Structure formats: structure tokens, C-alpha cells
Amino acid sequence: MRFIPKLKERFRAGSTQPAREIDPVRFRQVMSRFATGVTVITAESHGEIRGMTANGFLSGSLHPPLCVVSIAKGARMHETISAAGRFGVNMLAHSQEDVSAHFAGRPVAGLKFQFVHRDGTPLLADACARIVAKTDARHDCGDHSLFVGRILHMEADERPPLIVHASRYASLMYADDHAGTPSVEFW
């Protein structure tokens, strides 16, 4: 029973979190091991269109159709989505690394964008998939907010998505490209 006092020392009173601090650099490294698609979140407020590269995006519910985006509280996009009450999610195609870099704060000289509006929300015309969502709820999540959006509009083409893994862009390879690998149905 000697381990019980040591275990108690590791946890803060009233918390399930270990008392030690998590190194933010290491946290980012570990989280980057999860391969994910790259999106540009768009919104318009007071006549100004904003876009921000993000990979904190997920489907939230099928019934009703909801999606979730994670936005840093200090980001200009946080204020823009809050004011607009809606947002666009633009899933980038595998060839759109330059678009990702541009909206991540590394502008690409000469890069031009065409926006289309659906349900009052700007979307990148050349994204491989686009969603418009009306903000249904906002939840605090540490230094971020989770915006839950009710899907109003969605469209997609057949191009493969841009993927990021270990802080690098990656290519998508389908499992059924390997002989004998069965298809997987999640829905």
C-alpha cells in the first residue's frame, strides 16, 4: 500500500490530471502523429472575409448533421465566427499545399482565391469539399473554443484530400489498393 500516497501526490485535489506539467512542444509532437485532413475555415463579418488553416475539425453528429471546429480564443477567426454566427469548412485537395500555407500565415505571392457564397458564407471555389454551418453552440476548451455548427450546405468532388502527418504534408493511399484488403464501412 506504499504506492497509494505516491499516487495521491501525482494528482491535484479534485482533479483527474497528473500534477506534472505537459510540455507544449512535446504535446504538439505527439498530437501530430495523428494523420488528418487540412481545412481552411472561412467566415465573413462586417463585409470582411477571413480564412484560417485548421485541422481541428470533425463531424459531430449525423442526426442532426453537426460539425465541430476548434479555434484558438486569441485568433481573429474566433471573433469573426462569433460575430457571423456561421462558418465555412473548406477541405483542401491534395494539390493545395500553397493554399494551406497561405491561410496558415505564410502568404504565397501571386496566389489568388475565388470565393463562392452559399447560405451567406464564403467558401473557397476550388476546395475539394465545402460545408456551411450555422453556429449551434460554443464550448470552452482551454485556450480554444469548440464551435458546433449545424450543416446548412455541403458539396464535394472526387479529388483526394490534402493530409498532414507529423507536421508534414502526406499522400493518401487507400487500403484497398493492396490486394486482399477489404473495404471498411464506418457509417
Where would I find each of the regions flagged by the language model?
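Basic, polyanion-binding surface patches
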Residues: R2-W187
